[in-house]
Amino acid sequence: MQIFIKTLTGKTITAETEPAETVADLKQKIADKEGVPVDQQRLIFAGKQLEDSKTMADYNIQKESTLHMVLRLRGGY
């Protein structure tokens, strides 16, 4: 199923996923496609931050759902 991931810059990324796929799997796909390291990605759906070990079905993410990605930036100290 196709879903959309919207970034803070307003860019929309499309990704193929399945209900049984984990959030960690999806983050890896985004990393491969966009070059954003997995550990910097935070995905939000319906106001909730998604946990890596949960699946799309756990969050009721269905085809053409839109997730939001914010980046977790590391401190420079």
Swiss-Prot record:
Annotated Pfam families: ubiquitin
GO aspect biological process, one term: symbiont-mediated perturbation of host ubiquitin-like protein modification
Cross-linked sites for Glycyl lysine isopeptide (Gly-Lys) (interchain with K-? in acceptor proteins): 76
Main location: host cell
Covalent cross-link site, Glycyl lysine isopeptide (Lys-Gly) (interchain with G-Cter in ubiquitin): 48
Gene3D superfamilies named in the record: Phosphatidylinositol 3-kinase Catalytic Subunit, Chain A, domain 1
Positions of disulphide bridges: none
Name under which the protein is recorded: viral Ubiquitin
Native organism: Autographa californica nuclear polyhedrosis virus
